[in-house]
């Protein structure tokens, strides 16, 4: 009788899980913890093994004529698995609230909140990123841009890439310098050699192909003596503190694990403490101390008797102390980031939604996905 009680106690505290191998180095865990109760869905990725097998992490953006949203299941169609990403910002158009990089191209600039990024070699990094964007002219002058994919003020220089036309159909600026890439594609922590094809003035339709950029200068920004048609200029985009060439990134916030310690950084990232302390469905991403094991996590919530959701403290505790109970690599998360949650929380495996989204209408359209 004593042995039976001990075994039952372990089952109640530890919970149980179902496991499915999706690809070399990629495993899906469906975890049930009774003390919540919680249903937790985890994609565990052994990055070296998965990378060697050709598996890659990609971001996808919701599309429409003016920015837009799509369901995670649509964004992740054809992928091994996917989770929803960043918060949605809505004004005249809808778009991701923070940083997004896709296939080495910048889509949205970093904000005050943390973001997750990964290099071409599969090295992950969670940080609050800064942006340094501009061109180096043929004469050696560094023309630093003040903005990205938006209209410049009178004293500004702004860079547009081909993603700008998702939100804009025209450009209004004193001058615009059309750049054609000659060598290289990614501009994240790298430079691309380009040639100035033409100069435009005042207002014109915006149409850029991948590999083309536009420098738009305000009326009081004098770049005419530095750039001329036919010049070769180097376009750069740096995202400190990252040093590697980052190929994919998605925003979120707040950071909840820093160097193995629980660190719920809501005040630092100017987010709501109430949002952190209440139980909600949660989406998160984290990785191990050696940077070789990645975790994509969705916690169901707002469903009494099924799964009640987690506070950010509870989410961080699970990632820091309990993931290893289920992980094939026996690893916990050492760094962790909260992503958009609530009704947005969705995990897709093999084109099927595997969690239980909390909205009465089912899966919610989102700004982007991993």
Please identify what each model-predicted range represents:
Residues 1-10:
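Bacterial N-terminal signal peptides
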Residues 12-370:
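Gly/Ser/Thr/Pro-rich low-complexity, intrinsically disordered segments
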